[in-house]
Design a protein with these regions (language model features):
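Flexible "arm" and connector segments at domain edges
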Residues: 1-78
Length: 78
């Protein structure tokens, strides 16, 4: 199951990178934005499914800290 999780994470990364290409309008792809969003959702679902099968859970405290750091980065850019 760990190999499956790694594979699904890789597919999610690829889907996210394709969406980034669409947003930046660089390195054209025949995939539409709607298709890219659907693909991200599908791959994310696969990652969550694998994580569930492995009984992985979210660390809420870590998520809160990360949320604060990301928010600070956004505020600092503006």
């Amino acid at each position: 199951m760990l190999e499956q999780l790694a594979e699904e994470c890789t597919e999610l990364a690829k889907a996210a990178l394709k969406m980034a290409r669409i947003i930046r309008k660089e390195n054209p792809t025949p995939v539409t934005e709607k298709e890219a969003i659907a693909n991200i959702r599908e791959e994310y679902t696969d990652v969550v499914q694998c994580a569930g099968e492995l009984s992985l859970t979210v660390d809420e405290e870590q998520m809160a800290r990360k949320h604060e750091r990301w928010g600070k980065r956004v505020r600092d850019r503006t």
